[in-house]
Amino acid sequence: MRHTALPRVRSIGAARAASTAAPAPGAARSTAATGGGAAGGPRHVGRRIAVLAACGVLAVGCAEAGTAGTDSAGGNGGASSPVKVGLLYSKTGPLAAYGKQYLEGFKAGLDYATKGTGKVDGHPIEFVEQDDAGDPAKAVSGAKELIGKGYKILAGSTASGVALQVAPFAAQNKVLFISGPAAADKVTALNKYTFRSGRQSYQDTLTAASFVGDAKGRKVTVLAQDSAFGQANVAAVKAVLGKEGATVDAVLAPPSATDLTPFATQAKAAKPDLLFVAWAGETASALWTSLNQQDVFSSTRVVTGLDLAASYPLFGPAGEKISFLNHYFAGAAGTDIEKAMTEAVAKGGGKPDIFTPDGFTAAQMVVHAVEANKGSADDTAALVKALEGWSFDGVKGHLTVRAEDHALLQPMFQVRLTGSGAAAKPTVEKVLPSEQVAPPVLAMVG
C-alpha cells in the first residue's frame, strides 16, 4: 500500500543506516534566556533566535513519499506484525536543528531499549517521520493522516505550539502521544493520553531559582524584551520566586532596541541579588557585551539558560561570568546510558546536544509501554497505564513519569562556560535532583 502523504516506514535497522536532516542554517533557540546560532552567521543567527523565541520555551508537512505500511498499525496482526510509531517533529523549519537532535536520540534510544533487535516480543518497532516544520496546522494534519492509518502511538513535537494542538487531537482519538522538546507547562496534565519525554518550563525556572538559595527577602530582576516571550518569563519568575518571598521586578526593553546600554545600566541600578536574563533575537550578543561593559557581573549574580552548542560563542567574554541553568549538554550526565547514546549517535555521524535525550527517552517510553502489553499497541488505555508512575534510568539519570499529571521528573544542571568563542566549553557545577526541580502536581484536565 502506498500513500504519498506519509514518509517512508523505517524499522530500527533501517534507521541506523538512514541519513538525517541537517540543521537549518543558524537554527537555535533560547531556553529561558538568550539563544544561539550555527554557521549561518550573526544575521542569520539573530533571525533564527527571534523565530524560536516566539515559540516559547520558558515561556519552541513536508512529508517524504513512501510506503505507508499496513492498515493495522497496532501490532496484533500476528507474531511478527510491526508496531507503528508516528514521529511528528521539525525535520525542516526554524527548529530543524532540534528536530535532528530528537530524531538521532530516538534512533539511539530504540536501539538501546530493544537491545539492538529493534523488536519487542518479536514485533518490530517501526516509525515514520512526519515533518511538521514547527507548524501546528501541519502537525495536526499529519497526526490525522497517521491516526487514519491506525497508528496508536505518536511522538515528537519540537515546538510547544505544535504539542498543544496535537495533544487534544490525540486524546479525542484515544491515541498515545509522547511530546518531545516542547517545554510549555500546559502540556503536563493536558489529558490522560499525553506524556512528555523532555523537561518543562517550570523545571527551568526552579533551576534558575536554585542560584538564589533562600528566596525570602531577596530581590530578583528580570531583564527581558517587552514581548510575549519576555513577559512570560517575568510571570514565570514571579510565580516561582515571588511565591517563595522574593521581590521580583523587571527591566523591559523594546524588541526593536539596538542600543542596550541604558537597559544594562537600569538592571545594575536595580541592585538585585539575582539578575535573570531572558533574551532572544539578533541583539543577544550586543546585550551580553553591554552587561559586561557596564560591569554588571561584579555587582550581582547573572543567570540565564544554556542552549545548544552552536549558541555558546554568542556570550563572548561574558560567558565565563554567567551562571547557567541547563537541561542537558553533551557529557553533562556521566551515566552509562549517556555513554551508550553518545556512541550510537556518533556511529551515525552525529553528536549529542541539548535535545538528544528527549528523543532517547521517548523511545524508552514507547518500548516500555509496548513491552508491558506483550508487543501490542492496540489497547491505548493499557499503554497509558504502563507509563503512569514508571521510574527508570535514562540519559540524565533516574527519571519518573509522575502518575497524577504525567510530568517527567528529572535532574537539571547548574553549568559554567569556560573559554569564549569557538573554544567555549560547558562544565557541570551542580546536579539538581529531580525532587528539587519538580513542578507542582496538577489536576488532569482531560
Go through each PLM region and give its residues.
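Periplasmic-binding protein-like
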Residues: 87, 146-158, 178-180, 219-224, ...
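Bacterial signal peptide processing site
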Residues: 63-66
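Extracellular/periplasmic periplasmic-binding protein-like sensory domains
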Residues: 290-360, 371-374, 432-445
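Extracytoplasmic "Venus flytrap"
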Residues: 69-109, 117, 130-137, 159-161, ...
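Beta-alpha junction/loop-to-helix N-cap segments that form part of ligand/metal-binding clefts
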Residues: 70-72, 98-102, 112, 116-188, ...
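C-terminal motif of bacterial Sec signal peptides marking the signal peptidase cleavage site
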Residues: 58-61
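Solvent-exposed, acidic/polar segments of extracytosolic/periplasmic ligand-binding ectodomains
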Residues: 394-446
